[in-house]
Amino acid sequence: MHSFDGPGRTRPLLRRAALLGAALLAVTAAAPQASAATSGADRGPSGGGLSAVIRYTENGIPHILAQDYAHLGFGTGWAQAADQACVLADGFVTVAGERSRWFGADAATDGSLSSASKNLTSDLYFKGVREAGTVEKLLAAPAPAGPTRDLKELMRGWAAGYNAWLAQNKITDPACKGAAWVRPVSAVDVAARAFAVSVIGGQGRAVDDIAAAQPPARAASLAAGPTTGPTTGPATDPAAAAEAARAFFDTGRYDMGSNAVAFGGSTTANGHGLLLGNPHYPWQGGRRFWQSQQTIPGELNVSGGSLLGTPVVNIGFNEKVAWSHTVATGTPVNLHQLTLDPADPTAYLVDGKPEKMTRRQVSVQVTGGGSPVTRTQWWTRYGPVVTGLGPGLPLPWTAGTAYALNDPNAANLRGSDTALAIGRARSVTGIQDALKRTQGLPWVNTIAADSAGGTLFTQSQVLPRITDELAARCSTPLGRATYPASGLAVLDGARGDCALGSDPDAVQPGVFGPGKAPTLRDAPYAENSNDSAWLANAETPVTGYERIWGTLATPRSLRTRGAVEDVSAMAARGGLTVADLQKQQFANRVPAGDLAAADAAKACAALPGGVATASDGRPVDVSGACAVLAGWDRSADTGSRGALFFDRFWRKLTASTPAKDLWLVPFSAADPVRTPRTLNQAAPGIGRALADTVAELGAAGIAPDAPLGEHQFVVRGGQRLPVPGGTEALGVWNKIEAPWNAAAGGYPEVVHGSSHIQAVGWDGGRCPVARTLLTYGQSSNPNSPHYADQTRLFSQERWVTSRFCERDILASPQLEVVWPRERR
């Protein structure tokens, strides 16, 4: 099952190997813990190299047992490579800046580690990071500003484990079998991947615009370089700029989101807390989760999901606490508008004194050999010069003005330290303390519960220290448009008094300290679905934060509204158990349907002759759709008839009809969960959306009342697996996003959505009560037995019972134990 070449493979002697693992547990528990200074090769049982004991249970979930952090990293790197060698290797090509060399300069990236549109711009960015020594400098910084010794040992061990697996096994995944770009890595490579994840919401989103930035004369002659759009537009139109900035930072536009809810002891059956975590992440590529349990006896014992390439558990649980993250609304960057030296467009003025930009010349090797492609990047005291934030917000570099991007997470390599510290916490107070000490989360909220019944919501993310006062005092005209709309500050870079400053409790300059983070402690429930902190608990709104953290008293998404309705009702009902969390995950209620389907059916029935006019002007008989809408059960279960029709109809209607014309009752901050509501049956877009949907499905041979699962599915091993859940537009908790492909039968592949799901509680015993599900399985290798096993469970709305305690691990009927070791 788990390829291993050598004496560590123990399947023929399974029980003996199980006892070996138990013995190692007993020995290391009794022995004093290795210090960071003495942990490493001289302590391994393999004659000088690192090693670990890995016990695999059902669905290929590894329980990694090690004596210190280096050995734990080794076991984790080994086990990740066994499941995801090709995806990991692809990511290491990215952070090395070598995609153009292996895959072609003009080919599109997979978007896992940046938003670069082409391999060339990706390489120019990451090669520039590498040649500047950015990651090495961050690694050298002393903790807490830099990574701890424990984390460095984990990264060193992870690289050694990954390399050992590659050296001792043959890759069977066709994605990279025999590929020359699969190569050994170093601890710096592991850290470089962590850096990419840290900046993915900031510099990583602006990679094309960093590559495109050239002084005016040079930009005019660099026809072969990447471009980001016109040099006129929203930058000179305040309303358009505000909308472009809002859209650029809208969490709903990107392929990451999440739901999570923590319930306090007053709402549960036994007084212990409960946590349901449901991150919405990509199903393919380098931002997949991967499950494991990591154990250093007496030091660490944590189970959960890790982002690929990460040596720690990012979301999960231990004996006392459970936590998850949701993508936050904080704007992780700001711009500084530069006033340029009239004599030199590569110099800018600060308090009247010119400062030269730093010129970084970066060369990238491309396929076919020959001369490398060389470009120049321009950096300032604030960060890199950019020519826009996506095509919608051009920021032209003229003779008098340029724009620099400040991303404080480019100085943050602490994310894995935060995860490690949370994994060692014993209460939600301990989690809060871990966040305060490490301050490593770049773009997520934290929701947590503990065995004592405590709950926590906090938006403890690394953000530029942009106060509303600073924005009011220092915003340029562009910033006065973008900051209220999106939290994107554009500050006057020519004024020294517009520097960001520091908070006394911040571990790096220019960011907010954790004391400023929106936080809610010990509420009966704390929930987030990627809106701002305001309605983490609708009965106790969170207020008082600066605009850069998110909005207050503004409309919530349908997913937030539906989630708050559900979890507040659950909390009011009380007596909750893990089983209630499982029911919530797969309730598949469609809030948009509850709000609009009945009125849409009435509007349909009122159409003269049952005919509506489509977008192309053709009359379409929609009479058959009226009964489908009326009879639909308002769910996104695989057997639901009408869910597919409503989904296609609702997308078309909301894309063409502004909210002010769609609802009769507008949004009210006094009633934010229930407004806006009451569909305007007279809205002209309803008939058109009905006609377009009937025509679309008819052309594809799909009946209006076709069950959702017949047309929302994935194919694994030649088997079609129906997929439950619904889209962001529908507001479904169990979010599923799939590209529409009528020729292939509807939605034939999920691109992102529910991923590492966990429902966790406690019953007073030593072992947490946990059910988990990794929707896409542990492995991307179609030859692996764990390529689709959990996808089948997801299709059937079934769960994996977690094995956390030692007796449960050893009792697994599918137990397989391996003892990988480093060969020297």
Give residue spans per PLM region.
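Substrate-recognition/specificity elements adjacent to catalytic centers across diverse enzyme folds
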Residues: 40-274, 279-285, 296-299, 303-306, ...
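Glycine- and hydrophobic-rich flexible loops that cap the catalytic core of alpha/beta enzyme folds
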Residues: 296, 302-308, 316-321, 325-487
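Charged, long alpha-helical assembly modules
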Residues: 643-726
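Hydrophobic alpha-helical segments
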Residues: 441-570, 649, 653, 666
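Stable alpha-helical elements in mature extracytoplasmic
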Residues: 151-162, 285, 415, 430-434, ...
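Terminal end segments
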Residues: 537-615, 707-824
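Secretory targeting and sorting signals
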Residues: 1-38
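Gly/Pro-rich active-site capping loops and adjacent beta-alpha segments
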Residues: 66, 70-121, 324-372, 501-556, ...
